[in-house]
Amino acid sequence: MAGFGAMEKFLVEYKSAVEKKLAEYKCNTNTAIELKLVRFPEDLENDIRTFFPEYTHQLFGDDETAFGYKGLKILLYYIAGSLSTMFRVEYASKVDENFDCVEADDVEGKIRQIIPPGFCTNTNDFLSLLEKEADFKPFGTLLHTYSVPSPTGGENFTFQIYKADMTCRGFREYHERLQTFLMWFIETASFIDVDDERWHYFLVFEKYNKDGATLFATVGYMTVYNYYVYPDKTRPRVSQMLILTPFQGQGHGAQLLETVHRYYIASSSVLDITAEDPSKSYVKLRDFVLVKLCQDLPCFSRERLLQGFNEDMAIQAQQKFKINKQHARRVYEILRLLVTDMSDAEQCRSYRLDIKRRLISPYKKKQTDLAKMRKCLRPEELTNQMNQIEISVQHEQLEEQFQELVEDYRRVIERLAQE
């Protein structure tokens, strides 16, 4: 019996030691993957140029780890404009194949699932491609040029936005490289069917000089799908939008979204512009752009705003800027906050009630549904449903929603003031 206890203790300790040993070979793929946009040869050794994914779960599972390596580095370096790629896997040590019957993850195979063939694996080949980068030019039609002040007070940076499609020579291959970034920065990203001609592509590039030549660097892009609306209209829907990490916080998202809106505004066949499953950050960006577009419309004058939302606002927003009624309502709420003195009790109360009347609509629908349920539910089922829409809880949720909205709206107003 004592011998059995000693054996059991040994097995527990052995298992613990093995697990500890195996844990040393687990790497966080969010930090193991190193991304870089290269303009100059010295960028290869410059850690400041390195940035990292926000998500890796689509390739490496929910725990976002790779097993079997110590000191794992997955290098994905892109030439800044053409996005010609160098892919290499480096590590200090790899788990022995005979070590407790475990195998290292096929890291290279996982990355190959999303990057197109034709990439480099060594620095010399990559630098040879970099020497030819002056030949790269943006795809498609130039829509907009704008500048961003230099943080050091030097010459402004110049950026351009283009609209492209798959008929542009070389664009299909370029897009295959560009879309790989989606997997690292959009949580639910997926690749689109590029053979569907209803996709539109909008690209942002930085225009810069290098050794007397004009070059272009990829900044970000947006894909838009054109849905048919009976009988003769289309509804462009923003599907994917990404500004690459080194360029974030510089206003490129707003420039891109406004340019896309202005592109579709010119088309009489477009009904309105929407977005597919928009993130909170996208909604905030859209709020800013739409308010900026609408703020000078007569229907959004101070006098009209204080009278409440009306059909004319929805009509004008749709006709002038292809904005649907729901988004026009948000524009109204932001602009009304702008002209409301929230320190004035009466103005504040009026604004609060106006917003809450909209927010309460889903709760009223639940009340209507409950009235119908009374006719067919058993008492215990009815009690359960009533508990879900308790009045006091409704008021708390409404107030919380209201405060969150006002906070978001104030940020939009602050950004408008900086324009």
From Swiss-Prot:
Top-level EC class: transferase
Region annotation (Interaction with histone H4 N-terminus) ranges: 62-64, 225-227
Residues carrying N-acetylalanine: A2
Posttranslational modification: Phosphorylated by AMPK at Ser-190; phosphorylation increases HAT1 activity.
Main location: nucleus
Domain of life: Eukaryota
Phosphoserine carried by residues: S190, S343
N6-acetyllysine carried by residues: K9, K15
Site residues, Interaction with histone H4 N-terminus: W199
Residues at the active site: E276 (proton donor/acceptor)
Entry's Gene Ontology cellular component terms: chromatin; chromosome, telomeric region; mitochondrion; nuclear matrix; protein-containing complex
Binding-site residues, acetyl-CoA: M241, L242, I243, Q248, G249, Q250, G251, H252, G253, A254
Signal peptide positions (record): none
Keywords (A to Z) from UniProt: Acetylation, Acyltransferase, Mitochondrion, Nucleus, Phosphoprotein, Transferase
Gene Ontology annotations of biological process type: nucleosome assembly; response to nutrient; subtelomeric heterochromatin formation
Subunit structure and binding partners: Catalytic subunit of the type B histone acetyltransferase (HAT) complex, composed of RBBP7 and HAT1. Interacts with histones H4 and H2A. The interaction is dependent of the ability of RBBP7 to bind to the N-terminus of histones. Component of the histone H3.1 and H3.3 complexes.
Family: Belongs to the HAT1 family.
PANTHER family to which the protein is assigned, alphabetical: HISTONE ACETYLTRANSFERASE TYPE B CATALYTIC SUBUNIT
Protein's name according to its UniProt entry: Histone acetyltransferase type B catalytic subunit
Gene, per the UniProt record: Hat1
